[in-house]
A protein has these predicted regions:
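Positively charged N-terminal leader segments that act as targeting/secretion signals
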Residues: 1-26, 37-38
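Bergerat-fold GHKL ATPase/HATPase_c domain
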Residues: 37-91, 139-140
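GHKL-type ATPase core
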Residues: 42-57, 114-137, 148-281
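Conserved helix-loop functional segments at active or binding sites
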Residues: 66-69, 73, 96, 100, ...
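Conserved ATP-binding N-box helix of the HATPase_c
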Residues: 81-103, 166-171
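A conserved short beta-strand within the histidine kinase catalytic ATPase domain
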Residues: 104-109
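Noncatalytic partner-interaction/assembly domains of nucleic-acid and motor enzyme complexes
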Residues: 281-305
Length: 305
């Protein structure tokens, strides 16, 4: 047994030496990497110190320039998700009108060129002169970050958008946008290119309608991955909004495709029971453990709960 014992001991010692040798190599490698990193950082620090970091280095972007330069800060990204988010922001303004009790119908149209048109029968964005800005309130809403009626507790008790950020961001990120307002028997409009007004808000006619129409075409220099809207993505979102805001009727129309009868593809979303009906929709064909959905609703401080 002794020869085997000495052989085993010999092998064990060699293994220990091997482990020790590997640890030494790893330690030396880490030291070299640390020295290289320290040298690199010192070089960069010297380069930075040589740069003229002064007042001229500070950029003050005007208007919507910051939105166009950093769009992901406002809409999440510039891919498919961000592209569809533009629609959500405009629709949210119509939803706010509905929550305030002034809108019953919302229509979203995917046009043949993949531009989007949204229309509601709300009160219409105000078009009279804004005292502080010196331009029409419509132009303020469309071109100023943080502009909107949702900060005024007398105008909106609840809201679902980005509180004035949304529609101006959509305008900034659009190659072209046209806003048409039906308000107090008159039709007003203004068009924009990349967020900048092409002309002052002007009266273009008379009407017995009311509401706001916004048509926008996303800027291809910003949305470089795709400009094509997905019908199912928009349908899913609008369906959820109809459930979350019972009583509202939301129409989705896709002018890129026609059915056999010649009508455009589309569907209408409307819910009488709201979230209660939404739960049934989510259950689908599955057998529920609780036959009847338990739901409560009321009002607190004038806000539906």
């Amino acid at each position: 047994k002794k020869p085997y014992y000495f052989v085993s001991l010999f092998v064990f010692k060699r293994m220990l030496k091997g482990v020790f040798f590997c640890e030494v190599i790893l330690w030396l490698n880490n030291q070299i990497n640390n020295e290289q990193q320290t040298f690199y950082m010192s070089e960069k620090r010297e380069e930075f110190n040589k740069d003229n970091y002064s007042a001229d280095s500070i950029q003050a972007l005007e208007g919507m320039e910051h939105v166009r330069m950093r769009p992901s800060m406002y809409i999440g990204d510039t891919g498919t998700r961000g592209l569809h988010h533009l629609v959500y922001e405009v629709v949210d303004n119509s939803i706010d009108e509905a929550l305030a009790g002034h809108c019953d119908n919302i229509t979203v149209i995917i046009n043949e060129d993949n531009s989007i048109t949204t229309e509601d029968d709300g009160r219409g964005i105000p078009v009279d002169m804004h005292k502080k800005e010196g331009v029409s309130a419509l132009e303020v809403v469309m071109t100023k970050i943080g502009a909107g009626g949702k900060f005024d507790k007398d105008s909106y008790k609840v809201s679902g958008g980005l509180h004035g950020v949304g529609v101006s961001c959509v305008n900034a990120l659009s190659n072209h946008l046209k806003a048409t307002v039906y308000r107090k028997g008159e039709i007003w409009e203004q068009e924009y290119e990349k967020g900048k007004p092409m002309y002052p808000v002007k009266k273009v006619g008379e009407t017995d309608k009311r509401g706001t129409i916004v048509t926008f075409l996303p800027d291809p220099t910003i949305f470089t991955q795709t400009l094509e809207y997905n019908y199912d993505t928009l349908a899913s979102r609008l369906r959820e909004l109809a459930y979350l805001n019972k009583g509202i009727t939301i129409h989705l129309v896709d002018k890129r495709h026609k059915k056999d009868d010649g009508e455009f593809e589309g569907e209408t979303f409307h819910s009488k029971e709201g979230l209660k009906e939404f739960i049934k929709f989510l259950d689908g064909n599955r057998e529920p453990l609780i036959k009847e959905v338990i739901a409560f609703e009321g009002e607190k401080n004038g806000v539906p709960v």
